[in-house]
């Protein structure tokens, strides 16, 4: 089996003397930013930021931070293999395997950064907890001559912001509900006023056009569906916190 081959490969590899990840990263000066810092910077000028999600493509596909691009330092299969070795064999061997997988992506990473016009942008990297994956990807980016920052606490810290915000009672803004029959032009009206008034478009956040049309308009335009409740909450939070009209013109 593939697992048997993987374990044979690891058993025949000498990992003695491999430094810890902490030791490897200690020679790099990488700035740390909080989720709040990143949201503020995105709101000020999101075009000046390249926000990189270092998690696997599966994790990224389920939900992510707003405006982020995915560069999996470990893809789905590599993450599975590394986790298997970590649990069943040894932490040192798992680290060695993860670094081997990651280092093989150096040229792909270089092209990814060039494609995203990174020379004119601030690079910020995050993973699930703000640990090994984001740290190592930031190291690789540094080795290519850039100066990335890492998000402390990772995606989990962003989710805490979202959960805390929607758990507030009462809701921090007074809301006016726009109602009407399907096809009466509610969405068009929201779009018209969104430049001057704060707007929450629930249908857009859910990628769902009412009980009559459902996801059909989004399918026609090849818009990715919202995979889960977490992604829906993230979309709502993004609509509020990256929209300056919420802070400048909130209706009281």
Q: What annotation goes with each model-predicted range?
A:
Residues 42-117:
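Positively charged, proline/Ser/Thr-rich regional signature most characteristic
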Residues 1, 96-152:
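Catalytic cysteine-centered active loop of the rhodanese-like fold, especially the PTP/DSP P-loop
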Residues 198-252:
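Conserved nucleotide-sensing/catalytic segment adjacent to the nucleotide-binding pocket
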Residues 1-66, 163-170, 175-179:
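Flexible, polar/low-complexity N-terminal or interdomain linker segments that lie immediately upstream
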Residues 145-160, 204-206:
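A short glycine-rich beta-strand->turn/loop micro-motif centered on a GG-aromatic cluster
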Residues 32, 51, 68-70, 148-150, ...:
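Conserved beta-strand scaffold positions in the cores of enzyme catalytic domains, especially
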Residues 174-195:
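Glycine-rich phosphate-binding P-loop
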Residues 78-85, 158-163, 209-215:
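Short, charged, surface-exposed secondary-structure boundary motifs
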């Amino acid at each position: 089996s593939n697992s048997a081959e993987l374990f044979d490969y690891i058993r025949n590899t000498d990992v003695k003397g491999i430094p810890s990840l902490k030791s490897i990263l200690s020679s790099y000066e990488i700035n740390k930013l909080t989720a709040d810092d990143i949201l503020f910077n995105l709101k000020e000028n999101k075009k000046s930021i390249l926000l990189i999600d270092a998690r696997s493509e599966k994790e990224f596909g389920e939900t992510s931070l707003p405006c982020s691009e995915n560069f999996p330092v470990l893809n789905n299969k590599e993450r599975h293999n590394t986790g298997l070795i970590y649990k069943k064999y040894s932490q040192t061997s798992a680290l060695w395997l993860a670094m081997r997988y990651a280092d093989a992506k150096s040229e792909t990473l270089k092209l990814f950064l060039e494609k995203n016009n990174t020379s004119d942008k601030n690079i910020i990297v995050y993973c699930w907890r703000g640990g090994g994956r984001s740290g190592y990807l930031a190291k690789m980016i540094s080795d290519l001559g850039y100066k990335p920052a890492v998000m402390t606490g990772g995606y989990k810290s962003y989710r805490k912001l979202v959960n805390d915000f929607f758990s507030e009672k009462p809701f921090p803004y007074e809301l006016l509900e726009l109602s009407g029959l399907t096809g009466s032009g509610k969405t068009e009206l929201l779009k018209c006023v969104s430049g001057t008034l704060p707007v929450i478009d629930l249908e857009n956040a859910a990628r769902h056009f009412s009980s009559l049309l459902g996801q059909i308009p989004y399918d026609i335009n090849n818009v990715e569906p919202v995979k889960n409740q977490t992604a829906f909450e993230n979309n709502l939070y993004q609509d509020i916190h990256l929209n300056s009209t919420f802070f400048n013109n909130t209706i009281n």
